[in-house]
Amino acid sequence: MLRIGIVAHPRRKAMAEKLFADVDADVIRYDNSKRRVGCEANHRRVWADLVQIAKPGDWILCLEDDAVPVPCFRTSVTAALKHAPSPVVSLYLGQGRPSQWLPRMKQAVARADREDASWIVGDATIHGVGIAILGPDLVEEMLHKTVLYKGPIDQRMSMWLRQFQMRAAYTFPSLVDHADVETVIEQHPDGRPRERGRVAWRFGNRTKWSNRRVPL
């Protein structure tokens, strides 16, 4: 079974509730605007909520409120995850940032196109837009380990992956796009403004998924 949670900000309530309905999500958590828990802490709350309702063997998916899902989302994601080459899956590989990853992304996307690969596999979760983890035990391990790290949730998860020599598998094409709207984060950890252009390299679905993969 696929369990889905939405990480939401009050300024995007309408967007978040539409996403909640579109993907038939199980959980939604708002980062209260008066007593903010913070973006990273809100991610952790959603993961923890999903652990409480998930069973062994379930995929647990955390979506940010600006995720744009493909049609027939649950069916599409379930079909892809049957062939996942890793227990950690990102549904989004985006252009625009971070700049240091762009050359490698471009090469991987070109190779995936040539080889008709369903997956691009690397040692980092570059984006937090949509991440799925197999089983509540692994999610609990992630929560336990990443609390020791600093930085945004995607960077913390990347450190966790590298520490335990795990990989993140990106669906190709991406099963969620990124609604390239104004950020709700007042100050990003790197101090840099977010420019437009943060959309998926490829967005859509496949008629048939496989375990064919290329490296990132």
Residue ranges of predicted features:
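An acidic/histidine-cluster motif and surrounding catalytic segment
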Residues: 1-63, 67-216
